[in-house]
Amino acid sequence: MKISKDKLLNKTTSHEPEFIEALELLVDDINANKEINNFGIIAFMHQLNNRMNVREKIYKFAENKNMPDPAAPIIVTGLPRSGTTFLFDILCNDADHRSPLYWEITRPLPWLEKGSWRESLRIFATDAELRFARLVVPMLDAMHKLRALSPEECEQFNTVTAKSVVYIYMSHLPNYKKFLMETDFTNVFEWHKKFFQILELSGRPLSLIHI
């Protein structure tokens, strides 16, 4: 079982060269890894299909729109397992601050009024996916607790650009990892901006929190 780059590219009309380069390297490294079983390939396919769909929706929504710049960020940074996620979660309990929730990263559009019944459906669908993920990977909660309503880190959103450490957490991808260490992340921040501009349509916080 192999992942098709062409099928993924057909899901989105936004094809900046940096994105195509990253996606090609990612897919080639996944397909070359003989240690990934069919369940692993299915997990990658599900992740990539979702991210391409979200990428296209964001691109179409933001196209030709003059949206205000997002609020100034607070950036939480640190080494893995150093407590950054705890600090991130504490900051997100302050009503003046804002971080994307997990469901908003996986299902941000079409845009919804906050608190609508359609929002509840998206939250339910996201939690159902996460429950299944915990069945397949019982240690998932011990590694990184994920819930639909949990504030989530920027790397989860970066997946729409095909430049994210999330993919190297899923499998051993040495060539792709080397690429991430050396690549320019300008286009990643450009997509971040679009995403936060859309999130702020439901209310502008004092600051956005990044990790």
Mark where each language-model region is.
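Phosphate-binding P-loop
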Residues: 65-71
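Extracellular/lumenal mucin-like low-complexity stalks
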Residues: 1-12
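PAPS-dependent sulfation machinery
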Residues: 106-207
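Glycine-rich phosphate-binding P-loop
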Residues: 76-92
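Charged, amphipathic alpha-helical linker segments immediately N-terminal to NTP-binding catalytic cores
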Residues: 13-51
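Post-Walker A helix-loop "phosphate-sensing" segment adjacent to the P-loop in P-loop NTPases
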Residues: 94-103
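Conserved small/polar residues in nucleotide/adenosyl-binding loops
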Residues: 209-211
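N-terminal pre-Walker A segment at the start of P-loop NTPase domains
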Residues: 44-64
